[in-house]
Curated annotation (Swiss-Prot):
GO terms for cellular component: cytosolic large ribosomal subunit. It comes from Rhodopseudomonas palustris (strain ATCC BAA-98 / CGA009). One of its GO terms (molecular function) is structural constituent of ribosome. Homodimer. Part of the ribosomal stalk of the 50S ribosomal subunit. Forms a multimeric L10(L12)X complex, where L10 forms an elongated spine to which 2 to 4 L12 dimers bind in a sequential fashion. Binds GTP-bound translation factors. One of its GO terms (biological process) is translation. Forms part of the ribosomal stalk which helps the ribosome interact with GTP-bound translation factors. Is thus essential for accurate translation. This is Large ribosomal subunit protein bL12. The keyword Cell membrane does not apply. It holds the Pfam family Ribosomal_L12_N. HAMAP family: Ribosomal_bL12. Keywords: Acetylation, Methylation, Ribonucleoprotein, Ribosomal protein.
Length: 125
């Protein structure tokens, strides 16, 4: 047990550069890749059948244009973002603009549906 505690203490004292070098050395020694482990860990959250490794997990919702119902879109933007009336109006009039960044697919699809229902054109990136 004391040996494990010493290992924990040693690892805790590493700098970021030293930790990165350690990761590279362990990858080479064990024949694994840390990047593959991340992709495998993300795949179960994607649901369904075998998802491609490059499937995105974070999306940016971009308001492409307000369409014909600008007032409805401004109301939805306020509800989604919590912005004030002037800020939401400026965002809608300045389209294309990112509305939400770094959201998961489910949240991005929900926001997109809300905005499209209000008459906006929306892109997911």
């Amino acid at each position: 047990m004391a040996d494990l505690q010493k290992i924990v203490d040693d690892l805790s004292s590493l700098t970021v550069l030293e930790a990165a070098e350690l990761a590279k050395l362990l990858e080479e020694k064990w024949g694994v890749s840390a990047a593959a482990a991340v992709a495998v860990a993300a795949a179960p959250g994607a649901g369904g059948a075998a998802a491609p490794a490059e499937e995105k997990t974070e999306f940016t919702v971009v308001l492409a244009s307000a369409g014909d119902k600008k007032i409805e879109v401004i109301k939805e933007v306020r509800a989604i973002t919590g912005l004030g009336l002037k800020e939401a109006k400026d965002l809608v009039e300045g389209a294309p603009k990112p509305l939400k960044e770094g959201v998961n697919k489910e949240e991005a699809e929900k926001v997109k549906a809300q905005l499209e229902k209000a008459g906006a054109k929306v892109e997911l990136k």
